[in-house]
Amino acid sequence: MRCPFCAHDNSQVKDSRPSEDNTSIRRRRQCEGCGARFTTFERVQLREVVVVKSGERREPFDRSKIEQSVALACRKRPVNQERLDQLVSGIQRQIETMGDAEVASKVIGEMVMEGLRQLDSVAYIRFASVYRDFTEARDFEEFASSVQEMSVHEVSGGE
């Protein structure tokens, strides 16, 4: 593993343990060149997935894009990092277990929307405002009203 401090090619693993959500291995490493210590995370990748964007453009699936989007939507919200990691890991597992080599970005966006809906309603609305391209305050109002109606419907037992 290349050292992030001096770019030396070799490092030694000093400690390995599963992450808190058991979806990755956390490794403490020490650079053989400069002696600096750093942490890496190793995740299982079930299959290579290609994301089909609008306009039929294709790019490799990148977990960090979902992490960044979810983190931005949840910024300054009472949602801890562990919950965010669980959400992103769950979405990644869903994508990889679909069995398809390609997945539409729209499908991923809907998975993120559903995950955020269950996690935090404000984060859900924030993400939706970008994902669904809200252009006016009325768009926010209408969406927020529908979210509130869903919440009331779920609390009342779906009646």
From Swiss-Prot:
The keyword Chloroplast does not apply. GO terms for molecular function: ATP binding; DNA binding; zinc ion binding. PROSITE patterns: ATP_CONE. Residues 11-24 have a biased composition (Basic and acidic residues). Binds 1 zinc ion. A zinc finger (unnamed) spans 3-34. The keyword Transport does not apply. Its cofactor is Zn(2+). Keywords: ATP-binding, DNA-binding, Metal-binding, Nucleotide-binding, Repressor, Transcription, Transcription regulation, Zinc, Zinc-finger. Residues 1-26 are annotated as: Disordered. One of its GO terms (biological process) is negative regulation of DNA-templated transcription. Pfam families: ATP-cone, Zn_ribbon_NrdR. InterPro entries: ATP-cone_dom, NrdR-like_N, RNR_NrdR-like. Residues 49-139 form the ATP-cone domain. It comes from the Bacteria. HAMAP family: NrdR. Belongs to the NrdR family. Negatively regulates transcription of bacterial ribonucleotide reductase nrd genes and operons by binding to NrdR-boxes. This is Transcriptional repressor NrdR.
